[in-house]
Design a protein with these regions (language model features):
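Acidic (Asp/Glu)-rich catalytic clusters
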Residues: 20-29, 103-106
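Single conserved hydrophobic/aromatic residue that forms the stacking wall/gate
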Residues: 1-8, 12-13
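Aromatic-lined carbohydrate-recognition surfaces of secreted/lumenal glycan-active proteins
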Residues: 64, 68-82
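Distinct, well-ordered alpha-helical segments
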Residues: 14-21, 80-89
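Functionally critical loop-and-helix segments that line ligand-binding/catalytic clefts
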Residues: 87-132
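Active-site beta-loop-alpha junctions enriched in small/polar residues
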Residues: 9, 38-40, 76-78, 99-101, ...
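Alpha-helical scaffold elements lining the catalytic groove of polysaccharide deacetylases
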Residues: 10, 14-25, 42-59, 63, ...
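Structural recognition of the beta-strand scaffold that forms the well-ordered cores
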Residues: 5, 31-37, 70-75, 93-96, ...
Length: 132
């Protein structure tokens, strides 16, 4: 349910969101569809300003919402604090990744990803674990 943000313009993001909608059409997604924004080595979005990055997240979420799905933004705490204008995305669901025993995040959130090394019976590799 996460779409990585590897493109930089609002137009590209809307196109990407439309592609996601074609893939999820007909499915019930109670948690929604999330826009994944984070620093990626060599990623085009790394060069964007916080305002541009936020505008892309809003464009994605509004496109998803327009199709009747819940929309949200996924990232880690320092990215939410420093690379986005949180006030402009706070109306969407927030999925925060912070690998600690206790979450330290100043804003309202919906889902907390607390580890990337969880274990689940029947799955041999580590998995992300979330509370929401």
């Amino acid at each position: 349910e996460i779409m990585p943000s590897l493109v930089g313009s609002e137009m590209c993001i809307r196109d990407r969101a439309s592609m996601v909608l074609s893939l999820v059409s007909g499915y019930s997604l109670p948690l929604g569809v999330y826009y994944d924004t984070e620093s990626v080595s060599g990623g085009r979005a790394n060069a964007l300003s916080a305002a541009e990055r936020t505008a892309c997240a809003v464009a994605f979420c509004e496109t998803i919402r327009g199709a009747g799905y819940r929309a949200g933004v996924y990232s880690y705490a320092s990215w939410f604090y420093n690379a986005l204008n949180f006030a402009n995305i706070s109306k969407y669901n927030i999925w925060i990744a912070q690998y600690r025993d206790k979450l330290s995040f100043s804003y309202k959130y919906n889902i907390w990803q607390y580890t990337g090394s969880g274990r689940v019976n029947g799955i041999s590799k580590p998995v992300d674990m979330n509370i929401g």
